[in-house]
């Protein structure tokens, strides 16, 4: 399983935060997976500065995978403290990367495909620095 996520999936967890009212992107960041792979014990951290209070945000993550990724899906555990800086909300999410026939979902070119995973929404009550933590469940 160690090599499962090596070189064939890039979690660009471009953890996107979009203001619900006007579709403006509040935060977008990219992290690639090391060439030695994404180990089960590895966590991706995204530190998100929020300048507005009482903002309703739509949350999503983007994943890029190469066509040699051996599985149709990926499970992600996503934690964030957007609604209260001292309380963590955690969800386990499933992203279907390919259909049953092996056709990749999302958009792509050549052997690279990108899919978007909606995470949900959150109300940020105070400006501040917030964090996303993402691990895989494969």
Language model features by range: what are they?
Residues 22-25:
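Bacterial signal peptide processing site
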Residues 70-76:
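Short coil-to-beta strand junction motifs in C2/discoidin
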Residues 126-138:
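Internal, hydrophobic beta-strand segments that form the core of beta-sheet-rich folds
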Residues 93-123:
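An anionic, turn-rich surface loop/hairpin at beta-sheet edges
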